[in-house]
Amino acid sequence: MSSGKILPRRQAVPVLYTRGTHYEVGFDMGRTFGSMIKNFLILSKPLNETYLPLYQSPKGRQIYNETLGSVKDSFPQYVRELEGVADGAEVEFHKLFLLHLDEILPQALKHQPRSKNQPTGCSTIIVNQKNCRLLGHTEDALTETLNHYYFVVAHIISDKPQGKYNVKEEHFMSLCYAGHLPGYTMSHNHHGLVFSINTISAELLRSGKTPRHFITRALLATSNVDDAFRVLKDAGVGAADACSINFTFLADPRQMCYNVEMAPSPDRKNESHLNIKEVPLGEHNYHVNQFDRIRQDQANDLMISSSISRMQTFGAYNPPMSEQDVRHMLGDVSGGVYCVWRENNSCDEVVKTIAVGIFDLSARTISLYSDNPSETEPHCRLPLLYK
């Protein structure tokens, strides 16, 4: 029985290994973590206080249906995957899809105030040196998400090509929030893709377009840099909302890393608006939860204040050159209310850092932390999938 209670930080990193069709993999996620998913649906304030009431209105239902229809046209396999999660967990599908719509519904209805008026987000550090290639990432979220996440290692083989990119096989590992599809946090796949996501709260959102969570889910199937850019561009539809993607491919002969800022098209083009930054060998990069290069209005002042504070914290350090440097920076608590590592050891804190992952691109491993990486050792260090 789900209690709807927020627990103190657990020293645990759940990992599920599963294989099958999209529906079967989703069902396994739902069945395995059903109690966690049900609990999260009880606790989620944005879902219960904003998304569900708006969904009950005629206009809200219209926006929900047109966006679901758009996703079904492009990525029917991922809708089946989410249906599997709902069936396995024995929860209602529309609640899970509303979580994936995030702020699209309230923004399309000009609902005020926007529910996500909290400094949620995450921080990513890329180190691309000859002798040290790392991608480190904090996953920060509303406190109800604490202890409501898991890693999924999935191998999906379809009997015929799936979706707009005709994908037949996927093999990946991804951190998932309870009830969410893989791909919108930190992930890697068997083609050597490694990536992390920074949420950006754009003022301009588009209903009937592709929610960022489904674009990054499709990113999990990509096999090279051009393929990744094609998925992010989402020609014919385009992104409904905004985020930043930090990524590289292990086999890239250039050893190039990238940060891509993705936003809805300001010109109503049927494709995403992208700004691509290369991070070549010998360089490093930081990204948090604001546009650094795209010139679009942003909706969440607290998220912007938090982003500015975290970037100032990173800027006070010498450029990172080692895994220890990255651990110290991602565990930094010097920024006051908007520090990098967020934990005040009480359940009344609005936002917490729920997990940290550090990808070692040279050793081809990921180190997973559920607590401050500057003070603790990783729970585990897992080999990256690679063909």
From Swiss-Prot:
Protein localization: Cell projection, Axon; Cytoplasm
The protein's Enzyme Commission number: 3.5.1.-
EC category: hydrolase
pH behavior: Optimum pH is 6-8.
Site feature (Cleavage) residues: G121, C122
Catalysed reactions, as listed in the record: carcinine + H2O = histamine + beta-alanine; beta-alanyl-dopamine + H2O = dopamine + beta-alanine
Name of this protein: Beta-alanyl-dopamine/carcinine hydrolase
